[in-house]
Amino acid sequence: PIEKHHHEVATAGQNEIACQFNTLVKKADEIQVYKYVVHNVAHAYGQTATFMPKPLVGDNGSGMHCHQSISKDGVNIFAGDKYAGLSEEALYYIGGIIKHARAINAFRNASTNSYKRLS
C-alpha cells in the first residue's frame, strides 16, 4: 500500500513513492509487484520507468531508502534511554551495520550506478 508520493527535486519526472511498512519477506514481495506494475503502466502509456540510482549524468540521483525497526511483543526495541533516545539493542544494531558496511554494499549497492549516485 502507498502512503504518499511527490515529485522529486531532480528532472526527468523523478518521483518518490512511500510505501507502508510490512514484515521483511512480505515487503520484499510487495516491492517486486510494485516495480512490475510501474514498469507495465509506464509501457502502456508509451513511457519508460527505471529504478536506476543514477539514470542521468549531471542530474540528481535516486535512492531506495529503507526504514528499519524491530519490535518484540508489539514494543519497539529500538526506543530507550541511551544515546539519542535509543536502546542498547539499537546501538548494537547500528554498530553491526557500520561494522559490516562493506559486506552490506554487495546487496545494498549492487550496481556501478549505485556508486555514481554518491559522487
From Swiss-Prot:
Keywords: ATP-binding, Cytoplasm, Ligase, Magnesium, Metal-binding, Nucleotide-binding. Mg(2+) 2 binds at E8, E16. It is found in: Cytoplasm. It catalyses: L-glutamate + NH4(+) + ATP = L-glutamine + ADP + phosphate + H(+). One of its GO terms (biological process) is glutamine biosynthetic process. One of its GO terms (cellular component) is cytoplasm. L-glutamate binds at N60, G61, R117. ATP binds at E3, H67, Q68, S69. Involved in nitrogen metabolism via ammonium assimilation. Catalyzes the ATP-dependent biosynthesis of glutamine from glutamate and ammonia. This is Glutamine synthetase.
